[in-house]
């Protein structure tokens, strides 16, 4: 007679647990969604000043007690100076495109991505105060903001290199960079509404998107890991 083999009662629960884990939402998709939102936020921080500066430098009308009142522009900047302010971001942005890849490799793409967007968001929140202090300080601030936000694309590549399987890498990369035009499309009209109807006028555009960037940064720190 052969000895009857008893079923392993622990096998079924283990298999069931493994199946449930496989059926869950893959963590790499969470990373991709956060990267999409991060790049959308980067473009929001980058382009909101394009709309806000028109309200900063042009006279505007408001209605008070049934009367239309014309308020003078807060800043008397020439068109050339406005162009310098708008372009100053890119002076810093281009500097970190290649070194950003090394920083991502050296310190980890997830850490550098999160830290850089956090600092860029803080700088956006400070923009109204710095602009009212000195135009030179504003130009320096925008250059530094470009430096920090310039590392995001190299970090995006590094993060997907670790998280995305080869069969999905191209598709997941396309999803993340789609955040760039989406961020621009949302930011442009919303900045116009904020500069007109916001509680602090043009400054509201910087407070709004800077705050969004900080919220994104805290969520990133909580749920995203290096690998």
Protein language model features and the residues they cover:
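C-terminal ends and interior cores of transmembrane alpha-helices
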Residues: 118-132
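Residue-level signature of mid-helix packing/kink "hotspots" within the transmembrane helices
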Residues: 47, 89-98, 150, 184-185
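Helix-to-loop junctions at the C-terminal end of transmembrane segments
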Residues: 95-109, 195
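Glycine-rich segments within core transmembrane alpha-helices of 12-TM secondary carriers
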Residues: 168-199, 204, 210-213
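Cytosolic juxtamembrane N-terminal segment immediately preceding the first transmembrane helix
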Residues: 2-58, 62-76
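Cytoplasmic helix-loop-helix junction between adjacent transmembrane helices
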Residues: 139-180
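Helix-loop junctions at membrane interfaces in 12-TM secondary transporters
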Residues: 129-141
């Amino acid at each position: 007679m052969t000895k009857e083999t008893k079923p392993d009662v622990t096998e079924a629960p283990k298999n069931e647990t493994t199946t449930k884990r496989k059926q869950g939402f893959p963590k790499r998709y969470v990373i991709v969604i956060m990267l999409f939102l991060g790049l959308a936020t980067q473009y929001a921080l980058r382009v909101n000043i394009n709309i806000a500066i028109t309200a900063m430098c042009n006279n505007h009308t408001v209605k008070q007690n049934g009367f239309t009142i014309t308020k003078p522009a807060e800043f008397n900047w020439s068109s050339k100076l406005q162009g310098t302010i708008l372009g100053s971001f890119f002076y810093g942005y281009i500097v970190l495109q290649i070194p950003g890849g090394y920083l991502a490799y050296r310190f980890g793409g997830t850490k550098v991505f999160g830290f850089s967007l956090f600092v860029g968001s803080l700088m956006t929140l400070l923009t109204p105060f710095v602009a009212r202090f000195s135009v030179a300080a504003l130009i320096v601030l925008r250059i530094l903001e470009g430096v920090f936000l310039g590392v995001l694309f190299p970090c995006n590549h590094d993060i997907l290199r670790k998280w995305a399987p080869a069969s999905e890498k191209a598709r997941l990369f396309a999803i993340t960079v789609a955040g760039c035009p989406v961020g621009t499309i949302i930011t442009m009209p919303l900045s116009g509404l904020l500069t007109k109807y916001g509680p602090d006028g043009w400054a509201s555009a910087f407070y709004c998107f800077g705050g969004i960037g900080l919220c994104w940064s805290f969520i990133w720190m909580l749920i995203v890991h290096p690998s």
